[in-house]
Regions:
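Contiguous, well-folded functional domains in the mature portion of proteins
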Residues: 5-169
Length: 169
């Protein structure tokens, strides 16, 4: 708790001179360790380190100021390049590409500059569940190896106002 408060106050940035960048929760729900995702591609960090969120609602927001690199046409995932350089992948549910976009409504396009908190995707979580698919949403930093500091904050309910990843080069 004390460490988190010191991070928020910028203590470590002042002490060590490293800028700390924050990635906020893109979807409201319970933040869990990436290892809890029932898909080894995500759980074993093959695409990068991060967290996952068990969503409480079906709105995906920009987790920081960024540029949309790829908005998948099916709406099930989006990759962003954060202004700080982090390459972020948000994958809504597992195996949801097979739903062919039906439960998704996209609100951004490739190349769009987005601000933290801007709506990117809406998803009908009930439709995903009715299809028998998990709604757990991995949030990855694909270039996580580029960072010397990589902290995740899990085990609690989060909204777009909560930092879930902090990183520094």
């Amino acid at each position: 708790m004390l460490e988190r408060m010191l991070f928020q106050m910028g203590f470590f940035k002042k002490l060590f001179g490293k800028p700390v960048d924050s990635i906020y929760a893109p979807i409201a729900g319970k933040a869990v360790p990436i290892a809890e995702v029932p898909d080894p591609t995500f759980a074993e960090g093959m695409l990068g380190n991060g967290i996952a969120i068990e969503p409480a609602e079906g709105k995906v927001y920009a987790p920081c100021d960024a540029t949309v690199d790829t908005m998948f046409t099916t709406g099930h995932a989006v990759s962003l390049v954060a202004d700080c350089g982090a390459e972020i992948l948000i994958h809504v549910g597992l195996e949801t590409v097979g739903l062919e976009g039906k439960p998704f409504k996209v609100h951004a396009a490739n190349g769009d500059k987005v601000k933290k908190g801007q709506l990117l995707i809406e998803v009908d979580l009930d439709a995903v569940k009715e299809a028998g698919l998990p709604t757990i949403t991995p949030v990855l930093v694909c270039n996580s190896d580029d960072y010397t500091t990589f902290d995740t904050f899990v085990g609690k309910n989060v909204t777009n106002d909560d930092a879930v990843i902090e990183l520094a080069k």
